[in-house]
Design a protein with these regions (language model features):
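Right-handed parallel beta-helix
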Residues: 103-215, 220-223
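Acidic Gly/Asp/Thr-rich repetitive segments characteristic of extracellular carbohydrate-active
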Residues: 20-52
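All-beta strand scaffolds that present successive hydrophobic residues in beta-strands
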Residues: 63-64, 103-106, 126-131, 154-157, ...
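Short glycine/acidic-rich loop motifs that flank beta-strands on beta-rich extracellular proteins
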Residues: 51-57, 87-95, 113-120, 143-145, ...
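Right-handed parallel beta-helix/beta-spiral solenoid domain characteristic of secreted/periplasmic
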Residues: 20, 26, 61-138, 521-522
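Extracellular beta-strand solenoid repeats
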Residues: 45, 56, 64, 85, ...
Length: 522
């Protein structure tokens, strides 16, 4: 008997207390009162109503709205009917302060701080041009988030966070430990800061959130390494997703559209995100923009119908691979400000200006891209303002005054240029003071394959078809022009391979092959 009693005592001591459910307002008048009474593992279940309080969670507890998975107008219906009202004053406390291992599930959090519609509209109208660099940013002086995660691992899910005076959901990391909270399935809009803000070495998983009409980015990260997956960010005053100050996020599978600036914006030295498989469209600036010495990897994204470039780089060092840029109102891919880029295996189709523009002293290695535009005056590829480009093994279809314009230095080799229509201009137009080596390309359907004046030129080993009159035209070269080993194929018996005015270098082994009516060479 004594042994049996001893066993029962041992079981009682070793078995943890069963988790309890504390109900608000049935058992506790306020959410905070229920939280204070809860133990790790307990759930605070909150019924529909408006609760005018700001709360601080305890480790290991779940605070959840009562209800099921029924969807309402903005999010879950239960989140729409259980409202945490911060009182509309600035104060010193966030709307919700998360704790280690805690969960916040299914609330509307609003009125934390002072939301000013006039301030929001002013910055929306100016595209955030007058917005201070830290205004509304996580960890800026005086930041009071609606939901604050201070160097703890926790879960924030199914919430609606809106009309707050600062950032919606803020995550701050620590140099002493990994901070990897889960931020999922939330709706964050009309906050006077970012929708979700991440700073100071935090590494959260941010997925399946909808962030719109926030004063800064829908999702912003600085000096952090979050995983930003499958979110929808639209109509934000700045970028849909923004990263800066050495951030190294993975940004994957997001939709960013109709933002007042870029769909995804990357800036500052040391900032090196992987930006992949996103869809960025109808943004007021670039689909994906990067600048100021940032070093992003930009791959397999779709960028279309943006008001500036599909992908725009200003003074940065991107790797741009496998993207599709369509119908943007400026360039498909644009470089300026001494940018240095590798541009490989992209598809740029029907962009209003150039498919690829390399300007303002930039440098680019451009390989294995498909570049298409029907109609329009601008060239498909422009190397301008003393820029440098290596252009190899690309497929180019169409063009305006030229398929490719060179006002700088370019090596053009192994490409396939195909004109579209009888009024097609030159394939490669080399401007005064430029330097070009044009080798082993296939040109079909342009007025001339090469038209160069007052430049330094080497043209060799090219095949030229369906040109008009003169295949290669060189005028007044700054140094002797070398043109050799080129083959022109034409039905015109008067066709000429090379026409040079001015100083000649090596001009040899250029051949015209006359084409019969049946298309065969004679």
């Amino acid at each position: 008997m004594l042994r049996f009693i001893a066993v029962l005592i041992l079981i009682a001591v070793s078995t943890p207390a069963l988790a309890e459910t504390l109900r608000v307002p049935q058992g506790h008048r306020t959410i905070q009162a229920a939280v204070d009474a809860a133990q790790p593992g307990d759930t605070v279940l909150v019924s529909a109503g408006t609760y005018k309080e700001r709360i601080q969670l305890k480790p290991g507890i779940v605070v959840r709205s009562a209800g099921d998975k029924t969807v309402g107008k903005k999010g879950l219906k239960r989140a729409e009917t259980v409202i945490l009202d911060g009182g509309g004053k600035n104060g010193k406390k966030p709307g919700v302060l998360m704790a280690k291992g805690s969960t916040l599930d299914g609330f509307t959090i609003t009125n934390v701080g002072v939301y000013d519609e006039a301030i929001w509209k002013k910055h929306f109208d100016s595209q955030g041009e007058e917005l201070g660099d830290d205004e509304g940013s996580v960890q800026a002086e005086g930041t009071i988030p609606a939901v604050s995660i201070q160097a703890v691992n926790c879960t924030v899910t199914n919430n609606i966070v809106h009309h707050n005076g600062d950032v919606g959901i803020a995550i701050v990391g620590s140099k002493d430990q990994r901070v990897t909270p889960l931020i999922a399935n939330n709706v964050s809009f009309r906050n006077l800061g970012g929708g979700v803000g991440i700073a100071d070495l935090a590494e959260p998983i941010v997925r399946d959130n909808a962030c719109s009409e926030n004063l800064r980015a829908g999702i912003g990260c600085r000096n952090s390494s979050p995983f930003i997956f499958d979110n929808t960010c639209f109509n934000n005053v700045r970028a849909g997703i923004g990263c800066r100050e050495g951030a190294r996020p993975i940004i994957r599978g997001n939709k960013c559209y109709q933002n007042r600036r870029a769909g995804i914006g990357v800036r500052m030295k040391g900032t090196a995100p992987v930006v992949e498989n996103n869809e960025c469209y109808e943004n007021d600036m670039a689909g994906i923009g990067n600048r100021d010495d940032a070093e992003p990897i930009i791959r397999n994204n779709k960028c279309y119908k943006n008001k500036m470039a599909g992908i725009g780089s200003d003074g940065s060092k991107p790797l741009i691979v496998g993207n599709e840029c369509r119908e943007n109102l400026m360039a498909g891919i644009g470089l300026r400000g001494k940018a240095e880029a590798t541009i490989q295996k992209n598809k740029c189709v029907e962009n209003k200006l150039v498919a690829i523009g390399v300007t303002q002293g930039s440098t680019a290695t451009i390989t294995e891209n498909e570049l298409v535009r029907t109609g329009g005056v601008p060239p498909i590829i422009a190397v301008k303002d003393g820029s440098t480009a290596s252009f190899d093994n690309n497929d180019v279809k169409g063009g305006g005054v030229a398929a490719m314009l060179v006002q700088g230095t370019a090596t053009i080799s192994g490409n396939r240029f195909t004109g579209m229509g009888e009024k097609q201009g030159n394939a490669v137009w080399v401007w005064k003071g430029s330097k070009a080596t044009i080798a082993n390309n296939d040109f079909v359907g342009y007025r001339a394959a090469v038209n160069a004046s007052e430049s330094e030129l080497v043209v060799m080993g090219n095949t030229i078809r369906e040109f008009r009159g003169q295949a290669i035209v060189v005028k007044d070269s700054s140094k002797p022009a070398h043109v050799f080993g080129n083959t022109a194929i034409s039905k015109d018996e008067k066709a000429v391979v090379v026409a040079i005015q001015g100083t000649k270098g090596v001009v040899a082994d250029n051949v015209v092959k006359h084409q019969g009516e049946d298309g065969g060479e004679e």
